[in-house]
Structures are given as structure tokens and as C-alpha cells.
């Protein structure tokens, strides 16, 4: 066992003495040491229950003859960090989480790890650590929260964000906004739609790194506690089998994960996280692969924010395994999973509990919701290296649109003008200097897009940015524009009134300005300087472009 390096032989008497100070017995010294990597904290709704899941995991480890050791990682709530300076720290936290897990596991020579994350950047941070460390690992994602219920319909956090826009135009009273605020987030768990956290949980299950059914089992569901305990039991067997992440995850696994992502209409943030994750597995996953598979993989389930259904409905309809069953003719069924079985073997054992709901909300390949997958990659002279849009959440009227630019150099300026009514139907809002280096930190523009949505403008106004979007964003919102403005990308050269062409079916994003004019603007371009200190200064120096996953050297 790896852990023998800290507990075997007379020269390790001091190490054993310290372990015994924690209560470890001589008999436990002969058992596998399993790290339980918990991202529990008191401020993230998606994480407030993870202490209980960790206890279930540890019980499972003990049941199977292992010795659990729990330690914690940090976590940022994107919803609480949204719309202000705090969002600059969300994406950078991904690598900090990964690094801290590596430090703890390497320093203490654990035999295996159980990773317990829930929310947006925390799941990819844990997954990236698993790929980098390559010791037996299993992931227990924390599960979605229950949706709210207001005015006789289900609600979620996006209902509240869009309520702000509706309130600003007088469409919603202060009382009604307060009701949304009070009742839309139902307690423990990740936000209730197919936003980034739940997308990443689905991707984790599709990659084979969590047990079947884990992604959609809700935070308050006893099923989640059982999966946590079973994961603890399974990790001990994985240590004995030496079944490591790189034996499970291959390039074909990533293709499976992307196809599931496309079928469920997942968050555009996967185009950042999956390439970064592939990098830690020693693989190259180009942005173009997402578009290739999107053209081949239909959108099969209409979930929030692009449709009426919530994660609760998805779970009852069968969750990720049900979608993979629909996609089985396209998937690589020979890929291994953490339970030691292949994707195909798991699907053969999968049982649909609610056949009526399964049929109602998960479409078939023959009659999909949309013929193409949830995400499209656009290129053109405004985004030579690519940009992304959640096409499954775009109104058909806005899939092709040309309009004048309204240019803002930060999210705050854009938000002020949107709420002041300065953005009109037909406009294309441009928010720049919000990329990985320019922000720094590549903030999400959910406050801006939700305000536009709440004001009823998503059928007439588009937004393009070198920043990114929440998984809760809907509408013609195009992000991750590469190269970004701070690196002299064409988005830095856009002026108010310039015409921008968006054509999602043709995958085009063009600035309708002559090459000669653009060359003149480029010659005069001087990027603005921002005062950046602390961790963000280090991040700014080492982060790469969004089209390669925003990885950090």
C-alpha cells in the first residue's frame, strides 16, 4: 500500500506515534488509509450538508475495512459571488482546490480518495486533482436542492435573478420579488436546474467517476446517503484492485461526457472545465470537439434554464443513466466506471422506475427536442479562436441576428445601463475586459443576462463577452470570446454602433467592420491597466485562454 511509506518499519516509529495521537490503532495501521476530501462549509447551500455525507462515506470505508481521514477544501458559491468583485475569485478557485488536494494527499501518502464536492468550480477542482494524482478515487457529488414553489409554479435561483430585472421595469412588485427571494431556494443542494454544478455532476457520472445515479440524487434524498456509504465501501475495493482514474477515464470517456452534456443542455462552463480536466489526464480536448459532437448529438431533455423541467423531474425520470440509455447507440459502451463495470454493463442493469415520466420528459433520438446538442461553438473575425453559446436556451427568433453594439468595459457598467433602460430591442451588448487575464478571473455575466431576461428582452437583445456565463443563463448570450480583449483580441476593437452578425446555425460571429478599419483600430489600441494584487495577480500572470480551458501553469 502507498501508505506503508508512513507506517512500516522501525524508522517510521515517529510517524506512527503521530498517527496514534489521532487515535489510530496498531490493527488499523495494516488497513488502507483513505482520504475523505470534503468541501463542506456553512455559506454555500450546495455544501451545508456535506458533513453528513462525509460521515456516510466514512462509515462505508470502515464497513469495507479501511481507515478514513477527513480533510476539507475551500469552496466559492457562484450565486453569492455573482454581480460584484467576488466573482473574480470563482474560476481561480478551481486550481487552488486542485492544488490543496494534491498537497494533502501527497504529503500524507493516502491509498485512495473519496471526493465530496457539489458546486460549480469545486467539482472540476476535485476531478482535476483526481486526474493529477492518479490514485484510486471516487466522487460523491452533493446533489441538487429541491425547487421552490411560488404562484403555483416551480422556481429556482434564476427566477430570483430574473425577478430583479422584472422589478426594475415595474413588472414585478417588491412584495412579489421578496416572495421569490424567500421561497425559491429550497435548502441544501446545488441550484435546482441544469446549471453548472448539476451539469458537472452529470459529466462526472458520464465519465465513470461516480456511481450510477449519483448525479441527480438530491441532497435531501436518502438515496444520496446510501450512494455516499456505497462509495466509501467501493473505494476500499478500488485500492485493492489498484483501479485508478487514468484506467477509467480515456479520450472516449470524454466523448461520452460531452455527448451527455449536449443531450441534457448543460452549461457552457463545461467547455472550460473538461479541457482543463483532460489536461490533467494527459489528454488534449480541443474546443472544436464540443461542436463536432453537438452536431451529432441531439438535445433530449428540456431542463431549466432552457426549459420547464427541474432536476427533480430529471431524477425521477431516471437521471444520467436514462439519458445514456437513449444515447447508447452513440456512446462508447466499453468504457470502465468506478464500480468496476463498463458503461454498457451499467446500462444493462439500469431499471426505469417511473416509465411514464421517463417517456414524457426524455425525448428519443428519433424525436429529439432539438436536432443538435445544447452548446454551439461560433467563430469569425470577432472570435477567431472560438466562442460558445448554449443554443438550446436561445429563442428561435434570435438564432440569426445582426444588430448594433452597445460596448461596456466591465460588467458593472453594463448592468447599470441595462437597468437604466439604455439597452433597446435589437442591440447587442458587448462586455469586455472580463476574460481570464482581463478580469482577471473571467466573471460570469448572470446578473446582466438575467436582468435582460427579466425585462423581457431575450427575444430582441443579445450579449457577447470575453467573460463567461452561469449555467443558469438563457438567451442569445455568447461567451468565452477568444482571444480576449486584454490580449488584443478583436472584441477590444469594437465601438458603439458597430454592427455584429450572429448566426448560430452557421456557427458565425462576425464584426461587420472592414479589415482596413480594424487594422487602424488595432494600431491605436492600448489595453487598459488594472491594479491587481494577491492571488489574482499570480493568476493573471499564469492563466491561459478560455478556448484551452483557462488552465494555469
Swiss-Prot record:
Where are the catalytic residues? 470 (proton acceptor)
EC number(s) reported in the record: 4.2.1.9
**Name recorded for this polypeptide:** Dihydroxy-acid dehydratase
Q: Which Gene3D superfamilies match?
A: IlvD/EDD C-terminal domain-like
Q: Give the domain of life.
A: Archaea
| Gene it is expressed from | ilvD
Q: Which reaction does it catalyse?
A: (2R)-2,3-dihydroxy-3-methylbutanoate = 3-methyl-2-oxobutanoate + H2O; (2R,3R)-2,3-dihydroxy-3-methylpentanoate = (S)-3-methyl-2-oxopentanoate + H2O
**One cellular component GO annotation, for this chain's record?**
cytosol
DNA repair: is it a keyword of this entry? no
Where in the sequence is N6-carboxylysine found? Answer: 121
Listed binding positions for Mg(2+) are 78, 120-121, 444
**Binding-site residues, [2Fe-2S] cluster:** 119, 191
Needed cofactors, names only, are: [2Fe-2S] cluster; Mg(2+)
What is the annotated quaternary arrangement, including any partners? Homodimer.
Any single biological process term in GO: isoleucine biosynthetic process
UniProt pathway: Amino-acid biosynthesis; L-isoleucine biosynthesis; L-isoleucine from 2-oxobutanoate: step 3/4; Amino-acid biosynthesis; L-valine biosynthesis; L-valine from pyruvate: step 3/4
By its UniProt entry, which Pfam families does this protein fall under? ILV_EDD_C, ILVD_EDD_N
Function, in words: Functions in the biosynthesis of branched-chain amino acids. Catalyzes the dehydration of (2R,3R)-2,3-dihydroxy-3-methylpentanoate (2,3-dihydroxy-3-methylvalerate) into 2-oxo-3-methylpentanoate (2-oxo-3-methylvalerate) and of (2R)-2,3-dihydroxy-3-methylbutanoate (2,3-dihydroxyisovalerate) into 2-oxo-3-methylbutanoate (2-oxoisovalerate), the penultimate precursor to L-isoleucine and L-valine, respectively.
**Which PROSITE patterns does the entry link to?**
ILVD_EDD_1, ILVD_EDD_2
What keyword terms does UniProt attach to this protein? 2Fe-2S, Amino-acid biosynthesis, Branched-chain amino acid biosynthesis, Iron, Iron-sulfur, Lyase, Magnesium, Metal-binding
Amino acid at each position: 500500500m502507498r501508505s506503508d511509506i508512513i507506517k512500516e518499519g522501525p524508522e517510521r516509529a515517529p510517524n506512527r506515534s503521530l498517527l496514534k495521537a489521532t487515535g489510530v490503532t496498531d490493527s488499523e495501521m495494516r488497513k488502507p488509509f483513505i482520504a475523505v476530501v470534503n468541501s463542506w462549509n456553512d455559506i454555500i447551500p450546495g455544501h451545508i450538508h456535506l458533513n453528513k455525507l462525509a460521515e456516510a462515506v466514512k462509515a462505508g470505508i470502515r464497513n469495507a475495512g479501511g481507515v478514513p481521514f477527513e480533510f476539507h477544501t475551500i469552496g466559492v458559491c457562484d450565486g453569492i459571488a455573482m454581480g460584484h468583485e467576488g466573482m473574480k475569485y470563482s474560476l481561480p478557485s478551481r486550481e487552488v482546490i486542485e492544488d490543496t488536494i494534491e498537497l494533502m494527499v501527497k504529503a500524507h501518502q493516502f491509498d485512495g480518495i473519496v471526493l465530496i464536492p457539489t458546486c460549480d468550480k469545486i467539482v472540476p477542482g476535485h476531478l482535476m486533482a483526481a486526474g493529477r494524482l492518479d490514485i484510486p478515487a471516487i466522487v460523491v457529488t452533493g446533489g441538487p436542492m429541491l425547487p421552490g414553489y411560488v404562484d403555483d409554479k416551480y422556481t429556482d435561483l434564476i427566477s430570483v435573478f430574473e425577478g430583479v430585472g422584472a422589478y426594475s421595469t415595474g413588472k414585478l412588485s417588491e412584495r412579489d420579488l421578496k416572495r421569490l427571494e424567500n421561497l425559491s431556494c429550497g435548502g441544501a443542494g446545488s441550484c435546482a436546474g441544469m446549471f453548472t454544478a448539476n451539469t458537472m455532476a452529470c459529466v462526472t457520472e458520464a465519465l465513470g467517476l461516480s456511481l450510477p445515479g449519483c448525479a441527480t440524487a438530491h441532497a435531501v434524498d436518502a438515496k444520496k446517503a446510501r450512494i455516499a456509504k456505497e462509495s466509501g465501501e467501493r473505494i476500499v475495493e478500488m485500492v485493492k484492485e489498484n483501479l485508478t482514474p487514468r484506467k477509467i477515464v480515456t479520450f472516449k470517456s470524454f466523448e461520452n461526457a460531452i455527448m451527455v452534456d449536449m443531450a441534457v443542455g448543460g452549461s457552457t462552463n463545461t467547455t472550460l472545465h473538461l479541457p482543463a480536466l483532460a489536461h490533467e489526464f494527459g489528454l488534449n480536448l480541443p474546443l472544436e470537439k464540443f461542436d463536432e459532437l453537438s452536431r451529432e448529438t441531439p438535445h433530449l431533455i428540456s431542463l431549466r434554464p432552457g426549459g420547464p423541467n427541474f432536476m427533480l423531474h430529471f431524477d425521477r425520470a431516471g437521471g444520467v443513466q436514462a439519458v445514456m440509455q437513449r444515447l447508447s447507440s452513440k456512446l462508447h459502451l466499453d468504457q470502465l466506471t468506478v464500480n468496476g463495470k463498463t458503461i454498457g454493463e451499467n446500462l444493462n442493469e439500469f431499471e426505469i422506475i417511473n416509465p411514464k415520466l421517463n417517456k414524457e420528459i426524455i425525448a428519443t433520438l428519433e424525436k429529439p427536442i432539438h436536432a443538435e446538442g445544447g452548446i454551439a461553438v461560433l467563430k469569425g473575425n470577432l472570435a477567431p479562436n472560438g466562442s460558445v453559446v448554449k443554443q438550446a436556451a436561445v429563442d428561435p427568433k434570435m438564432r440569426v441576428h445582426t444588430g448594433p453594439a452597445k460596448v461596456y468595459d466591465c460588467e458593472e457598467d453594463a448592468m447599470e445601463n441595462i437597468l437604466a433602460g439604455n439597452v433597446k430591442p435589437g442591440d447587442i451588448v458587448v462586455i469586455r475586459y472580463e476574460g481570464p487575464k482581463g478580469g482577471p478571473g473571467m466573471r460570469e455575466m448572470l446578473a446582466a443576462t438575467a436582468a435582460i431576461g427579466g425585462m423581457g428582452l431575450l427575444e430582441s437583445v443579445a450579449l457577447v463577452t470575453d467573460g463567461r456565463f452561469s449555467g443558469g443563463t438563457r438567451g442569445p448570450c455568447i461567451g468565452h470570446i477568444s482571444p480576449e480583449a486584454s490580449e488584443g483580441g478583436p472584441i477590444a476593437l469594437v465601438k458603439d454602433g458597430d454592427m455584429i452578425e450572429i448566426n448560430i446555425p452557421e456557427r458565425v460571429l462576425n464584426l461587420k467592420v472592414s479589415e482596413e478599419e480594424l487594422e487602424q483600430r488595432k494600431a491605436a489600441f492600448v489595453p487598459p491597466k488594472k491594479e491587481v494584487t494577491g492571488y489574482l495577480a499570480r493568476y493573471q500572470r499564469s492563466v491561459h485562454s478560455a478556448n484551452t480551458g483557462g488552465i494555469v501553469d
